[in-house]
Amino acid sequence: MTGWHRGGLAAVGVAVAAGIVLHWFGSVDAVNQMLSDTVSSAPGAALLGVACAALVVAAGCLAVGARHAARSGLVRGLLGLWAAGLAALAVFPTNLPGTAVTTGAVIHRYGAALAVAVPPAIGLLVARTRRLRTASMVTGGAAALYGAAHLPAMLTGAEILPYAGLAERVVLGMTLLVVVMTAAALREGSEEWT
Protein backbone atom coordinates (compact mmCIF):
# COMPACT_ATOMS: atom_id res chain seq x y z
CA MET A 1 0.00 0.00 0.00
CA THR A 2 1.44 3.36 -0.99
CA GLY A 3 1.60 6.50 1.13
CA TRP A 4 -1.01 8.40 -0.88
CA HIS A 5 -3.37 5.41 -0.67
CA ARG A 6 -2.95 5.07 3.11
CA GLY A 7 -3.40 8.82 3.48
CA GLY A 8 -6.55 8.82 1.36
CA LEU A 9 -8.12 5.96 3.29
CA ALA A 10 -7.17 7.54 6.62
CA ALA A 11 -8.73 10.83 5.50
CA VAL A 12 -11.97 9.06 4.55
CA GLY A 13 -11.89 7.37 7.97
CA VAL A 14 -11.52 10.74 9.70
CA ALA A 15 -14.44 12.12 7.68
CA VAL A 16 -16.65 9.16 8.60
CA ALA A 17 -15.70 9.43 12.29
CA ALA A 18 -16.41 13.18 12.30
CA GLY A 19 -19.72 12.56 10.53
CA ILE A 20 -20.76 10.02 13.14
CA VAL A 21 -19.66 12.11 16.11
CA LEU A 22 -21.40 15.27 14.86
CA HIS A 23 -24.74 13.52 15.32
CA TRP A 24 -24.13 13.54 19.07
CA PHE A 25 -24.27 17.35 19.14
CA GLY A 26 -27.41 19.42 18.77
CA SER A 27 -30.84 18.15 17.97
CA VAL A 28 -30.57 17.20 14.30
CA ASP A 29 -32.91 14.41 13.28
CA ALA A 30 -30.79 12.05 11.16
CA VAL A 31 -33.88 10.76 9.34
CA ASN A 32 -35.60 14.01 8.44
CA GLN A 33 -32.93 16.74 8.55
CA MET A 34 -29.89 17.44 6.41
CA LEU A 35 -26.40 16.76 7.69
CA SER A 36 -25.62 20.44 7.10
CA ASP A 37 -28.21 21.39 9.72
CA THR A 38 -25.64 20.39 12.33
CA VAL A 39 -24.21 23.91 11.93
CA SER A 40 -26.87 24.93 14.46
CA SER A 41 -24.29 24.10 17.16
CA ALA A 42 -20.64 25.16 17.30
CA PRO A 43 -19.37 21.57 17.77
CA GLY A 44 -21.56 20.39 14.89
CA ALA A 45 -20.26 23.12 12.60
CA ALA A 46 -16.66 22.34 13.58
CA LEU A 47 -17.09 18.61 12.97
CA LEU A 48 -18.76 19.21 9.60
CA GLY A 49 -15.72 21.33 8.73
CA VAL A 50 -13.37 18.56 9.88
CA ALA A 51 -15.23 16.00 7.75
CA CYS A 52 -15.06 18.24 4.68
CA ALA A 53 -11.39 19.08 5.27
CA ALA A 54 -10.56 15.39 5.62
CA LEU A 55 -12.24 14.66 2.30
CA VAL A 56 -10.30 17.51 0.67
CA VAL A 57 -7.15 15.74 1.91
CA ALA A 58 -8.51 12.49 0.43
CA ALA A 59 -9.01 14.27 -2.90
CA GLY A 60 -5.40 15.45 -2.78
CA CYS A 61 -4.15 11.96 -2.00
CA LEU A 62 -6.15 10.50 -4.87
CA ALA A 63 -4.79 13.21 -7.18
CA VAL A 64 -1.28 11.99 -6.35
CA GLY A 65 -2.40 8.44 -7.12
CA ALA A 66 -3.98 9.55 -10.40
CA ARG A 67 -0.73 10.85 -11.87
CA HIS A 68 -0.35 7.70 -14.00
CA ALA A 69 -4.04 7.06 -14.58
CA ALA A 70 -5.60 7.06 -18.01
CA ARG A 71 -7.03 10.54 -18.53
CA SER A 72 -4.91 11.75 -15.61
CA GLY A 73 -5.56 15.43 -16.33
CA LEU A 74 -9.32 14.99 -16.38
CA VAL A 75 -9.32 12.80 -13.26
CA ARG A 76 -7.15 15.28 -11.37
CA GLY A 77 -9.30 18.19 -12.53
CA LEU A 78 -12.43 16.43 -11.28
CA LEU A 79 -10.71 15.72 -7.97
CA GLY A 80 -9.99 19.45 -7.74
CA LEU A 81 -13.65 20.20 -8.49
CA TRP A 82 -14.70 17.73 -5.78
CA ALA A 83 -12.33 19.42 -3.32
CA ALA A 84 -13.77 22.84 -4.25
CA GLY A 85 -17.30 21.57 -3.58
CA LEU A 86 -16.22 20.20 -0.21
CA ALA A 87 -14.52 23.49 0.65
CA ALA A 88 -17.75 25.34 -0.21
CA LEU A 89 -19.63 23.04 2.16
CA ALA A 90 -17.28 23.90 4.99
CA VAL A 91 -16.88 27.63 4.34
CA PHE A 92 -20.46 28.61 3.46
CA PRO A 93 -23.01 27.42 6.03
CA THR A 94 -26.50 26.50 4.94
CA ASN A 95 -29.52 28.34 6.22
CA LEU A 96 -31.25 26.64 9.11
CA PRO A 97 -34.78 25.32 8.55
CA GLY A 98 -37.35 28.09 8.63
CA THR A 99 -34.86 30.88 7.88
CA ALA A 100 -34.27 32.84 4.67
CA VAL A 101 -32.06 31.31 2.00
CA THR A 102 -28.83 33.31 1.75
CA THR A 103 -26.25 33.49 -1.03
CA GLY A 104 -23.92 31.48 1.20
CA ALA A 105 -26.57 28.80 1.60
CA VAL A 106 -26.97 28.56 -2.18
CA ILE A 107 -23.19 28.20 -2.59
CA HIS A 108 -23.26 25.54 0.13
CA ARG A 109 -25.94 23.62 -1.75
CA TYR A 110 -24.02 23.70 -5.03
CA GLY A 111 -20.99 22.46 -3.10
CA ALA A 112 -23.11 19.62 -1.73
CA ALA A 113 -24.20 18.70 -5.24
CA LEU A 114 -20.56 18.56 -6.38
CA ALA A 115 -19.62 16.53 -3.31
CA VAL A 116 -21.90 13.66 -4.33
CA ALA A 117 -21.95 14.02 -8.13
CA VAL A 118 -18.22 14.16 -8.87
CA PRO A 119 -16.88 10.96 -7.19
CA PRO A 120 -19.07 8.61 -9.28
CA ALA A 121 -17.85 10.34 -12.45
CA ILE A 122 -14.25 9.87 -11.33
CA GLY A 123 -15.01 6.24 -10.50
CA LEU A 124 -16.30 5.68 -14.02
CA LEU A 125 -13.19 7.27 -15.51
CA VAL A 126 -10.74 5.08 -13.59
CA ALA A 127 -12.83 1.89 -13.40
CA ARG A 128 -10.94 -1.21 -14.39
CA THR A 129 -13.54 -3.57 -12.97
CA ARG A 130 -17.24 -4.09 -13.40
CA ARG A 131 -17.63 -3.68 -9.63
CA LEU A 132 -16.39 -0.07 -9.64
CA ARG A 133 -18.33 0.78 -12.82
CA THR A 134 -21.51 -0.61 -11.29
CA ALA A 135 -20.96 1.10 -7.93
CA SER A 136 -20.25 4.39 -9.71
CA MET A 137 -23.33 4.15 -11.92
CA VAL A 138 -25.63 3.16 -9.05
CA THR A 139 -24.21 5.91 -6.82
CA GLY A 140 -24.44 8.49 -9.59
CA GLY A 141 -28.04 7.45 -10.26
CA ALA A 142 -28.92 7.62 -6.57
CA ALA A 143 -27.30 11.06 -6.29
CA ALA A 144 -29.21 12.28 -9.37
CA LEU A 145 -32.50 10.91 -8.07
CA TYR A 146 -31.90 12.43 -4.64
CA GLY A 147 -30.90 15.74 -6.23
CA ALA A 148 -34.02 15.83 -8.40
CA ALA A 149 -36.26 15.12 -5.40
CA HIS A 150 -34.42 17.70 -3.29
CA LEU A 151 -34.23 20.40 -6.00
CA PRO A 152 -37.28 22.42 -4.89
CA ALA A 153 -35.88 22.68 -1.36
CA MET A 154 -32.43 23.56 -2.72
CA LEU A 155 -33.61 26.33 -5.00
CA THR A 156 -36.50 27.85 -3.11
CA GLY A 157 -36.06 26.84 0.50
CA ALA A 158 -39.27 24.78 0.36
CA GLU A 159 -39.82 22.05 2.94
CA ILE A 160 -37.69 18.97 2.39
CA LEU A 161 -39.30 15.63 1.70
CA PRO A 162 -39.87 13.15 4.52
CA TYR A 163 -36.85 10.90 5.10
CA ALA A 164 -34.63 13.32 3.15
CA GLY A 165 -31.98 13.18 5.88
CA LEU A 166 -31.83 9.40 5.76
CA ALA A 167 -31.69 9.43 1.96
CA GLU A 168 -28.88 11.99 2.08
CA ARG A 169 -26.86 9.85 4.47
CA VAL A 170 -27.34 6.75 2.30
CA VAL A 171 -26.13 8.68 -0.78
CA LEU A 172 -23.16 10.01 1.21
CA GLY A 173 -22.27 6.49 2.33
CA MET A 174 -22.49 5.23 -1.24
CA THR A 175 -20.31 8.13 -2.38
CA LEU A 176 -17.62 7.37 0.19
CA LEU A 177 -17.66 3.71 -0.84
CA VAL A 178 -17.01 4.79 -4.43
CA VAL A 179 -14.14 7.01 -3.21
CA VAL A 180 -12.55 4.04 -1.42
CA MET A 181 -13.04 1.80 -4.47
CA THR A 182 -11.60 4.51 -6.72
CA ALA A 183 -8.53 4.75 -4.48
CA ALA A 184 -8.06 0.99 -4.85
CA ALA A 185 -8.35 1.22 -8.64
CA LEU A 186 -5.83 4.06 -8.76
CA ARG A 187 -3.47 2.10 -6.50
CA GLU A 188 -3.65 -0.92 -8.80
CA GLY A 189 -2.95 1.31 -11.79
CA SER A 190 -0.01 3.04 -10.11
CA GLU A 191 1.54 -0.31 -9.10
CA GLU A 192 1.86 -1.13 -12.80
CA TRP A 193 4.20 1.89 -13.10
CA THR A 194 6.52 0.79 -10.29
Residue ranges, per PLM feature:
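Terminal transmembrane helical module of multi-pass membrane proteins
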Residues: 130-194
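N-terminal membrane topogenic signal
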Residues: 1-11
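Interfacial helix-start motif at the membrane-water boundary
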Residues: 37-57
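Membrane-proximal helix-loop-helix units in multi-pass membrane proteins
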Residues: 85-129
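Membrane-interface interhelical loops and short amphipathic "cap" helices
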Residues: 28-42, 97-103, 156-164
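Aromatic-anchored segments of alpha-helical transmembrane domains
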Residues: 16-20, 82-91, 141-152
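Membrane-interface helix-boundary motifs at transmembrane edges
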Residues: 64-75, 128-135, 190
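Alpha-helical transmembrane segments of multi-pass membrane proteins
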Residues: 12-30
